[in-house]
């Protein structure tokens, strides 16, 4: 016969409404939408996204710590849950651009102390990490000492250089161009974040065949406003993955 109902610690009256799971976008950039956080939240929620993990490296590249603090303040009261990461690679191309800010270990400590900052933003200078650059490694170490997750960007690395990146504690990558690279990163313990632009039948098949499903997720990365309004947000990436198998 039917089992007895379980006792609950808390009961919530849904008022004849439906309870549905929401999408979590674990790697994205709010600035790409060209919207204020408030207006982005309206669009994202209408597409089923309830949580985003945003790397504000464009804001930090211009306004530094105060820019990230201002963004955190603007996101705090939104109906959309926004977790920020501390931009790690500012400037993104040292010596090749004029930047309004420079992130070293002291600046990283200050960024991680901002309420709402939950991790290290994508480490884009993979060549510096692979070469053992002291400044870049000290930024990563500062974040690791806070016990936060460490986001990566390692599209060009394979083999020993990719292993070095993982050994530094980098947890994830969202630049997976092939099924072979996806399998290699999963084997090394990365969380693999797959963007819509990287989805194809080979990658989707590798995702389906992967022995570790809970370290694969779909993300948006950058969604310009016209595409956001025309296609949606993370829901479009999910729909595309389903279409591909």
Model-derived features with residue positions:
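Divalent metal-coordination and catalytic microenvironments
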Residues: 16, 27, 48, 71, ...
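Divalent metal-binding pocket/active-site signature
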Residues: 121-180, 196-198
């Amino acid at each position: 016969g039917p089992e007895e109902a379980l006792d609950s610690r808390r009961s919530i009256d849904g008022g004849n409404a439906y309870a549905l799971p929401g999408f979590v976008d674990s790697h994205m950039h709010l600035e790409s939408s060209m919207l204020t956080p408030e207006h982005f939240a309206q669009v994202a929620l209408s597409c089923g996204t309830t949580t985003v993990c945003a790397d504000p490296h464009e804001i930090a590249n211009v306004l530094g710590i105060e820019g990230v603090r201002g963004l955190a303040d603007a996101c705090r009261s939104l109906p959309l849950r926004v977790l920020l990461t501390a931009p790690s690679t500012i400037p993104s191309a040292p010596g090749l651009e004029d930047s309004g800010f420079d992130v070293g270990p002291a600046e990283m400590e200050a960024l991680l102390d901002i309420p709402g900052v939950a991790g290290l933003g994508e480490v884009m200078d993979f060549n510096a990490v692979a070469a053992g650059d002291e400044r870049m490694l000290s930024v990563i170490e500062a974040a690791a000492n806070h016990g936060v997750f460490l986001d990566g960007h390692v599209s060009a690395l394979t083999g020993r250089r990719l292993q070095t990146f993982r050994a530094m504690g980098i947890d994830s990558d969202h630049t997976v161009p092939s099924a072979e690279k996806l399998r290699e990163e999963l084997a090394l313990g990365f969380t693999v974040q797959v963007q819509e632009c990287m989805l194809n039948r080979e990658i989707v098949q590798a995702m389906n065949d992967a022995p570790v499903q809970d370290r694969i997720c779909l993300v948006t990365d950058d969604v310009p406003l016209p595409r956001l309004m025309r296609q949606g947000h993370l829901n479009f990436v999910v729909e595309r993955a389903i279409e591909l198998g």
